[in-house]
């Protein structure tokens, strides 16, 4: 007698619809992971679109014949100073030696690229403290950011007050390019300072990030924290300000219709001067500084609410 034959079981079948959904879900998950990775990479590296620091300091004030002292301050948790810079005293008998200029350089290079500007300030006759932000020159290695630059500028003010014993009402903060935007923020936050000098502030410096083609693929406005809101800082300014603007003729340049009007909205007593680009300090540059410093006590009084 033959044993009963077992029924052949049918192999399981997979629904085509289910398979399509599984493949779609896998593709969506992969796309989401790729997009999140892109967001992370943009968040991590976008600072390089705005800041262009270099480490090697090629020049010092000695190259311009200036006496100076190397300085280091803002001690970190490891006990080492985070910031390096130069103290350049005014020449003996200089007209404005009672004033000290805290110089904030721009977003590119390092302190070694500012020797010509510092030499021009020395001709004006003021004391100068210039330093590199973290991530620049010989200062502590770090990615620059608006918050870091702001903290470093505050540390420089503390150094002037605590180590150099400089009175706040004799400190003028000068900034160039992005440094001018930083000087605006510092000036708005410290009404006890003598004033600010703004050399070609940037109307919207962070636009370089938002105009980059890669920013269209990610929520750049949520990923970028830096703003450098010049208009907001200008409105809050309550101390005297000198605005140095460049034009090829040295004459005022007509403002664009979309100009945010940083100067127009600035508070406090203000003075604006248009200068031709020059490799050496022009007489117009020196005259602008002299006029502004001569009138600074009166301007300070006029700026008080």
Spans of model-derived segments:
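Active-site nucleophile loop of the alpha/beta-hydrolase fold
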Residues: 197-207, 226-229
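Membrane-embedded segments
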Residues: 78-161
């Amino acid at each position: 007698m033959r044993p009963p034959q077992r029924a052949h079981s049918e192999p399981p079948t997979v629904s085509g619809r289910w398979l399509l959904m599984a493949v779609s879900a896998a593709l969506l998950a992969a796309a989401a992971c790729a997009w999140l990775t892109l967001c992370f990479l943009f968040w991590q590296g976008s600072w390089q679109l705005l800041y262009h620091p270099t480490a090697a300091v090629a020049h010092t004030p000695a190259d311009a014949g200036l006496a100076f002292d190397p300085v280091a301050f803002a001690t970190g948790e490891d006990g080492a100073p985070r910031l390096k810079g130069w103290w350049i005293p005014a020449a003996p008998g200089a007209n404005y030696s009672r004033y000290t200029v805290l110089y904030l350089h721009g977003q590119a290079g390092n302190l070694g690229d500012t020797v010509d500007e510092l030499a021009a300030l020395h001709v004006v006759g003021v004391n100068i403290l210039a330093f590199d932000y973290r991530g620049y020159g010989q200062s502590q290695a770090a990615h620059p950011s608006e918050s870091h630059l702001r903290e470093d500028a505050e540390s420089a003010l503390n150094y002037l007050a605590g180590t150099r014993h400089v009175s706040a009402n004799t400190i003028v903060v000068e900034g160039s390019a992005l440094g001018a935007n930083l000087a605006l923020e510092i000036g708005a936050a410290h009404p006890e300072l003598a004033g600010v000098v703004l050399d070609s502030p940037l109307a919207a410096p962070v636009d370089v990030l938002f105009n980059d083609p890669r920013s269209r693929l990610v929520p750049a406005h949520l990923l970028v924290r830096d703003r450098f809101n010049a208009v907001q800082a200008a409105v809050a300014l309550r101390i005297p300000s000198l605005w140095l603007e460049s034009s090829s003729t040295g004459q005022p340049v007509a403002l664009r219709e979309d100009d945010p009007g940083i100067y127009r909205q600035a508070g406090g007593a203000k003075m604006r001067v248009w200068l031709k680009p020059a490799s050496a300090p022009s007489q117009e540059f020196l005259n602008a500084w002299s006029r502004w410093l001569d009138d600074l006590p009166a301007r300070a009084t006029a700026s008080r609410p």
